[in-house]
Every structure is written in C-alpha cells, then in structure tokens.
C-alpha cells in the first residue's frame, strides 16, 4: 500500500511540473510592429530581393508543440492515475519476467540433462532412427558400430 501512495504522490508532482514549466516558457511576447527586420534573398548578387522576416511560423510551431505536449502529458497522467491499471501492468510484467527466467532455466539445464541421459543409457534407437531418415550412409555406419 505504501508503494501505491508513494507513486501517486510522485505522479502528482510530475503532473504539476510540466504545466508550470510550460506556463513560464510560453509567456506572451510583446507584439512590436517596428521589430520586424528585413533580409536579402537571391540566387546571385544581382537579383537580390528584400524579404520581411517573420516569427509567426516559429510561434505557430511552438504553440502546436506545446498543445501536443500538454495533451500527451494529461493523457499519460489520466492513464497512470488509475491505480488498478498500474497494478495490472506491473503484475503482468512481473509474471512475464518470471516465465522468461523459467524458460531460460529449462533450456539451459533440463534439456541438456535429458540429452545426456539418453546418451548415457545407450538409448541409440532414437538417434539411429533419426539419422536413418536423414541420410543412408549414417545408418550403415551406426548399425556397424552398435552391433
């Protein structure tokens, strides 16, 4: 229970931090008409054109990014505030990790033991039947060795 309340407190702190940071960054800039500067553009020195520089595209991209970020953070926090869903995600990942570990232990420990047991008990029937299906010369060699 303590972990769930601690994670809830951390989520509330994280929820407040991005909104506070974005409010500081996205303060409205003063709109000055005299501040617009001009820029020369052209392919060669002879055909330059005077073009007015504008920050409207940059402001538009920033506001789009800000809105997208706020939307994503709010959806993330709505999702993570549901403690039952958070518990299910953690439990499923824990179960998957345990199953993966048992799978590794099985293939590194039990399968070689079964193969070794088959060889030590001189259980060549399986091996000869398998090799006879694969290639005819192996069947002749194994029949001579076993007999």
Swiss-Prot record:
Region (Disordered) residue spans: 23-48
Top-level taxonomic group: Eukaryota
Composition bias type Polar residues, residue spans: 28-37
Example of a GO cellular component annotation carried by this entry: endoplasmic reticulum
Protein name stated in the entry: Uncharacterized protein YGL230C
Membrane spanning residue stretches: 85-105
Start-end of Basic and acidic residues biased regions: 38-48
Membrane topology (UniProt): Single-pass membrane protein
Keyword annotations of the record: Membrane, Transmembrane, Transmembrane helix
Subcellular location: Membrane
């Amino acid at each position: 229970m303590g972990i769930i309340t601690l994670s809830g407190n951390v989520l509330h702190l994280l929820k407040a931090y991005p909104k506070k940071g974005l409010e500081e960054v996205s303060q409205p800039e003063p709109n000055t008409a005299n501040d617009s500067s001009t820029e020369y553009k052209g392919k060669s020195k002879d055909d330059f054109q005077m073009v007015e520089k504008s920050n409207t595209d940059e402001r538009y991209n920033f506001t789009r990014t800000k809105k997208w970020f706020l939307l994503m953070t709010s959806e993330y926090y709505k999702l993570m505030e549901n403690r039952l869903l958070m518990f299910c995600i953690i439990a499923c990942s824990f179960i998957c990790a345990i199953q993966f570990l048992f799978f590794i232990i099985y293939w590194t420990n039990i399968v070689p033991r079964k193969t070794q047991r088959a060889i030590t008990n001189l259980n060549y029937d399986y091996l000869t039947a398998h090799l006879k299906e694969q290639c005819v010369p192996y069947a002749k060699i194994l029949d001579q060795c076993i007999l």
